[in-house]
Protein backbone atom coordinates (compact mmCIF):
# COMPACT_ATOMS: atom_id res chain seq x y z
CA UNK A 1 0.00 0.00 0.00
CA UNK A 2 1.43 3.37 -0.99
CA UNK A 3 1.84 5.90 1.78
CA UNK A 4 0.79 9.53 1.52
CA UNK A 5 4.06 10.87 2.94
CA UNK A 6 5.14 14.39 2.02
CA UNK A 7 8.91 14.42 1.63
CA UNK A 8 10.93 17.58 2.27
CA UNK A 9 14.66 17.95 1.59
CA UNK A 10 15.80 20.66 3.99
CA UNK A 11 19.51 20.69 3.17
CA UNK A 12 21.97 21.58 5.93
CA UNK A 13 20.18 23.24 8.82
CA UNK A 14 21.04 23.93 12.45
CA UNK A 15 19.73 21.29 14.81
CA UNK A 16 17.84 23.50 17.26
CA UNK A 17 15.51 25.15 14.69
CA UNK A 18 14.77 21.70 13.23
CA UNK A 19 13.98 20.34 16.68
CA UNK A 20 11.71 23.27 17.46
CA UNK A 21 9.96 22.97 14.09
CA UNK A 22 9.21 19.28 14.73
CA UNK A 23 7.66 20.15 18.08
CA UNK A 24 5.52 22.91 16.57
CA UNK A 25 4.39 20.68 13.70
CA UNK A 26 3.46 17.83 16.03
CA UNK A 27 1.62 20.04 18.52
CA UNK A 28 -0.43 21.66 15.75
CA UNK A 29 -1.34 18.57 13.75
CA UNK A 30 -4.87 17.19 13.59
CA UNK A 31 -6.14 13.74 12.58
CA UNK A 32 -6.28 15.06 9.01
CA UNK A 33 -2.72 16.43 8.88
CA UNK A 34 -0.68 14.61 6.21
CA UNK A 35 2.37 12.74 7.43
CA UNK A 36 5.74 14.20 6.44
CA UNK A 37 9.34 13.07 6.10
CA UNK A 38 12.05 15.67 6.64
CA UNK A 39 15.52 14.83 5.34
CA UNK A 40 18.50 16.99 6.22
CA UNK A 41 22.00 17.17 7.65
CA UNK A 42 23.20 19.24 10.58
CA UNK A 43 26.31 21.22 11.44
CA UNK A 44 28.28 19.59 14.28
CA UNK A 45 26.14 19.07 17.39
CA UNK A 46 25.76 16.60 20.24
CA UNK A 47 22.20 15.79 21.27
CA UNK A 48 21.23 14.27 24.60
CA UNK A 49 18.16 12.09 24.99
CA UNK A 50 15.98 11.84 28.08
CA UNK A 51 18.15 9.02 29.43
CA UNK A 52 21.36 10.93 28.70
CA UNK A 53 24.01 11.30 31.38
CA UNK A 54 26.51 14.13 31.50
CA UNK A 55 29.41 11.74 32.09
CA UNK A 56 28.93 10.29 28.61
CA UNK A 57 29.95 13.65 27.11
CA UNK A 58 33.50 14.07 28.33
CA UNK A 59 35.12 16.41 25.81
CA UNK A 60 32.64 18.35 23.66
CA UNK A 61 35.09 21.15 22.94
CA UNK A 62 33.41 23.80 20.78
CA UNK A 63 30.61 21.46 19.64
CA UNK A 64 27.30 22.47 21.26
CA UNK A 65 25.35 20.00 23.39
CA UNK A 66 21.56 20.19 23.06
CA UNK A 67 19.19 18.54 25.53
CA UNK A 68 16.18 17.01 23.77
CA UNK A 69 13.03 15.09 24.64
CA UNK A 70 13.77 12.05 22.48
CA UNK A 71 14.52 8.64 23.88
CA UNK A 72 18.04 7.34 24.32
CA UNK A 73 21.33 8.94 25.26
CA UNK A 74 23.96 11.07 23.57
CA UNK A 75 24.72 11.01 19.85
CA UNK A 76 26.50 13.20 17.35
CA UNK A 77 25.22 14.84 14.18
CA UNK A 78 27.45 16.43 11.59
CA UNK A 79 28.07 17.03 7.89
CA UNK A 80 28.11 13.87 5.80
CA UNK A 81 25.29 12.24 7.76
CA UNK A 82 21.77 11.76 6.39
CA UNK A 83 19.19 12.59 9.05
CA UNK A 84 15.57 11.59 8.47
CA UNK A 85 12.67 12.76 10.62
CA UNK A 86 9.41 10.85 9.96
CA UNK A 87 6.45 12.81 11.31
CA UNK A 88 3.80 10.11 11.43
CA UNK A 89 0.41 9.52 13.00
CA UNK A 90 0.88 5.99 14.31
CA UNK A 91 -2.81 5.55 15.07
CA UNK A 92 -3.61 6.24 11.43
CA UNK A 93 -0.73 4.05 10.27
CA UNK A 94 -2.08 1.19 12.36
CA UNK A 95 0.98 0.06 14.29
CA UNK A 96 2.70 0.73 17.61
CA UNK A 97 6.09 2.09 18.60
CA UNK A 98 7.89 -1.27 18.74
CA UNK A 99 6.91 -2.03 15.15
CA UNK A 100 7.70 1.55 14.16
CA UNK A 101 11.28 1.12 15.38
CA UNK A 102 11.53 -2.18 13.50
CA UNK A 103 10.27 -0.56 10.29
CA UNK A 104 12.75 2.30 10.51
CA UNK A 105 15.59 -0.14 11.08
CA UNK A 106 14.40 -2.24 8.15
CA UNK A 107 14.43 0.84 5.90
CA UNK A 108 18.06 1.48 6.87
CA UNK A 109 18.98 -2.17 6.31
CA UNK A 110 17.39 -2.09 2.85
CA UNK A 111 19.23 1.13 2.05
CA UNK A 112 22.55 -0.45 2.97
CA UNK A 113 21.78 -3.47 0.77
CA UNK A 114 21.87 -1.14 -2.24
CA UNK A 115 25.57 -0.60 -1.48
CA UNK A 116 26.42 -4.23 -0.82
CA UNK A 117 26.44 -3.74 2.96
CA UNK A 118 24.62 -5.96 5.45
CA UNK A 119 23.07 -4.13 8.37
CA UNK A 120 22.48 -5.95 11.66
CA UNK A 121 20.32 -5.38 14.71
CA UNK A 122 21.60 -5.90 18.26
CA UNK A 123 19.12 -6.84 20.97
CA UNK A 124 18.62 -4.06 23.50
CA UNK A 125 20.50 -1.46 21.45
CA UNK A 126 18.36 0.19 18.76
CA UNK A 127 20.18 1.21 15.61
CA UNK A 128 21.96 -0.58 12.81
CA UNK A 129 25.43 -2.13 12.98
CA UNK A 130 27.87 -3.60 10.47
CA UNK A 131 30.61 -6.21 10.75
CA UNK A 132 33.96 -4.45 10.76
CA UNK A 133 35.80 -7.43 9.27
CA UNK A 134 33.26 -8.12 6.51
CA UNK A 135 30.56 -5.44 6.03
CA UNK A 136 28.81 -7.53 3.39
CA UNK A 137 28.55 -10.69 5.50
CA UNK A 138 25.11 -12.22 5.96
CA UNK A 139 26.29 -14.54 8.74
CA UNK A 140 24.06 -14.41 11.81
CA UNK A 141 25.48 -12.44 14.71
CA UNK A 142 25.84 -13.98 18.17
CA UNK A 143 24.15 -10.72 19.25
CA UNK A 144 21.16 -11.57 17.03
CA UNK A 145 17.74 -10.13 18.00
CA UNK A 146 16.37 -13.54 19.01
CA UNK A 147 18.64 -13.43 22.05
CA UNK A 148 16.55 -10.87 23.87
CA UNK A 149 16.83 -9.59 27.39
CA UNK A 150 20.57 -8.97 27.37
CA UNK A 151 21.41 -6.47 30.10
CA UNK A 152 24.69 -5.48 28.44
CA UNK A 153 24.55 -5.74 24.64
CA UNK A 154 27.74 -7.03 23.01
CA UNK A 155 29.26 -4.97 20.20
CA UNK A 156 32.31 -7.15 19.58
CA UNK A 157 33.44 -6.84 15.98
CA UNK A 158 30.70 -4.36 15.14
CA UNK A 159 30.53 -0.69 14.20
CA UNK A 160 27.40 1.42 14.50
CA UNK A 161 26.41 3.06 11.23
CA UNK A 162 22.90 4.34 12.06
CA UNK A 163 21.37 5.69 15.26
CA UNK A 164 17.72 6.07 16.26
CA UNK A 165 16.13 8.48 18.69
CA UNK A 166 12.37 8.85 18.81
CA UNK A 167 9.54 10.69 20.53
CA UNK A 168 5.83 9.91 20.40
CA UNK A 169 3.29 12.53 21.46
CA UNK A 170 -0.45 11.92 21.10
CA UNK A 171 0.37 8.91 18.89
CA UNK A 172 2.45 11.13 16.61
CA UNK A 173 6.16 10.67 16.03
CA UNK A 174 9.09 13.01 15.67
CA UNK A 175 12.88 12.87 15.86
CA UNK A 176 14.14 9.93 13.79
CA UNK A 177 17.20 8.20 12.35
CA UNK A 178 20.71 9.25 11.31
CA UNK A 179 22.74 7.26 8.76
CA UNK A 180 26.46 7.96 8.50
CA UNK A 181 27.70 8.41 4.93
CA UNK A 182 31.06 10.21 4.81
CA UNK A 183 31.77 12.08 8.03
CA UNK A 184 34.54 13.32 10.24
CA UNK A 185 34.12 10.62 12.89
CA UNK A 186 36.51 12.18 15.42
CA UNK A 187 33.71 13.84 17.45
CA UNK A 188 32.40 10.37 18.35
CA UNK A 189 35.62 9.77 20.30
CA UNK A 190 34.60 12.56 22.70
CA UNK A 191 31.45 10.78 23.85
CA UNK A 192 30.20 7.34 24.75
CA UNK A 193 27.87 6.93 21.75
CA UNK A 194 24.37 6.03 22.91
CA UNK A 195 25.84 5.64 26.40
CA UNK A 196 28.13 2.72 25.52
CA UNK A 197 31.82 3.14 26.30
CA UNK A 198 34.01 1.88 23.50
CA UNK A 199 31.23 1.54 20.93
CA UNK A 200 32.86 2.15 17.55
CA UNK A 201 31.04 4.35 15.06
CA UNK A 202 31.56 3.98 11.32
CA UNK A 203 30.25 5.45 8.11
CA UNK A 204 29.88 4.11 4.58
CA UNK A 205 33.22 5.65 3.63
CA UNK A 206 35.02 3.84 6.47
CA UNK A 207 33.84 0.46 5.22
CA UNK A 208 34.85 1.15 1.64
CA UNK A 209 31.63 2.47 0.11
CA UNK A 210 31.92 5.62 -1.98
CA UNK A 211 28.47 7.21 -2.04
CA UNK A 212 27.25 10.78 -2.20
CA UNK A 213 25.01 12.35 0.42
CA UNK A 214 22.25 13.06 -2.11
CA UNK A 215 22.25 9.48 -3.38
CA UNK A 216 21.96 8.02 0.11
CA UNK A 217 19.35 10.59 1.15
CA UNK A 218 17.16 9.73 -1.84
CA UNK A 219 17.46 5.99 -1.24
CA UNK A 220 16.77 6.25 2.48
CA UNK A 221 13.76 8.45 1.77
CA UNK A 222 12.41 5.88 -0.68
CA UNK A 223 12.92 3.01 1.75
CA UNK A 224 11.33 4.86 4.66
CA UNK A 225 8.33 5.74 2.52
CA UNK A 226 7.95 2.07 1.60
CA UNK A 227 8.58 0.44 4.96
CA UNK A 228 6.60 2.91 7.05
CA UNK A 229 3.51 2.40 4.88
CA UNK A 230 0.48 0.89 6.68
Swiss-Prot record:
Gene Ontology BP annotations: protein modification process
Site (Lowers pKa of active site Cys): 160
Organism: Albidiferax ferrireducens (strain ATCC BAA-621 / DSM 15236 / T118)
The organism's place on the tree of life at top rank: Bacteria
EC id: 2.3.1.181
Bilayer-crossing regions: none
Residue runs in coiled coils: none
Active site: 194 (acyl-thioester intermediate)
Protein name, UniProt field: Octanoyltransferase
GO molecular function, a single term: lipoyl(octanoyl) transferase activity
UniProt-listed NCBIfam families: lipB
Pathway(s) per entry: Protein modification; protein lipoylation via endogenous pathway; protein N(6)-(lipoyl)lysine from octanoyl-[acyl-carrier-protein]: step 1/2
Amino acid sequence: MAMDLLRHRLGRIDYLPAYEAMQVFTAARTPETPDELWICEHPPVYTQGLAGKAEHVFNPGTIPVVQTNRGGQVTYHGPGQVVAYPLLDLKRAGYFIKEYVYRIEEAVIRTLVEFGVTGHRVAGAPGIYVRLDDPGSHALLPQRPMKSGLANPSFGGLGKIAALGLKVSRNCTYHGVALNVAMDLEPYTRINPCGYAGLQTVDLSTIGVCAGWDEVAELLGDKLTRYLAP
